[in-house]
Each structure stands twice: as structure tokens, then as C-alpha cells.
Amino acid sequence: MVKNYINIYNNLVNFTRNKKIFIIFTKEDTFGDRLLILLIHFAFFLKNYKNHEDKKTMQELYDYFFRQLELSIREIGYGDATINKKMKNYINVFHSMLNEIEGWNNLTLVEKSALIKNYLNTNEKVDKLSEYFDNRKSVV
């Protein structure tokens, strides 16, 4: 993995912009929903690449990702106090996701679907989402 983090970030963002994929995830096209989808993709990315890169590189990527996320939130127009509160919440949600996704390969389809459903708060096509992430291991 080359230390060109912008390409990784942009590719992950592009996953959330793909309308066909987005329709699978949720009925609503909101910033919050897209952010959750982005965080899930990033969690899978880190899970899949953590053993292929050194800790320093992975930490740099993590820092870059959340710096870019913060900049995006600022561009929307939120103030400093709101941004700090939102970023703390997003990082906590992300770490919870990352923790649960770590054992993804050992989960049943029902358990995988429950995990996804917990974060996206949807009953729509949850099994398809689990299959989506099973099939995207090498892509994400």
C-alpha cells in the first residue's frame, strides 16, 4: 500500500456514492447514513489490511481518514463545538464497529446481519449487506 492516503480515502468515499450500492444500505440518502456506510467500509479496510502494513502506516492512514472526515464536516458548515462533539461520537461508533467487524469471518450470516442492522438501523436487505461485505473483502 503506497502512502497515498487520498486515493484510499477517495475510493472509500466513492463506495458511498454508488447509487446501486447505496440503495442496498438504506432508503434515506442523508449525510449521517452515508457517513455510517463510509465508516463501515473503512472498518473493513483496516481489518483486511492491518496485517499487510506496519502499525505506523496504518496509524497515519487512520489519522488522515479522520482528518478528512473532520474537514468534510466543517465544509457542511458546523461550528467548532459541534464538530468536536460529532467527531467524538463518530470515532466512538467507528471503534465499536471495528471491534465487532474484527470477528466477521467467524460470524454466521444471521450474526453478520444483526451487526449491520445495529449500525444502519434498517431491516431492508440486511442479508444482502452481509453478502456484500463478504464479497468485497479484497476490494475494500
Predicted regions and their residues:
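Surface/interface-facing alpha-helical segments and adjacent flexible terminal/loop regions used
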Residues: 1-140
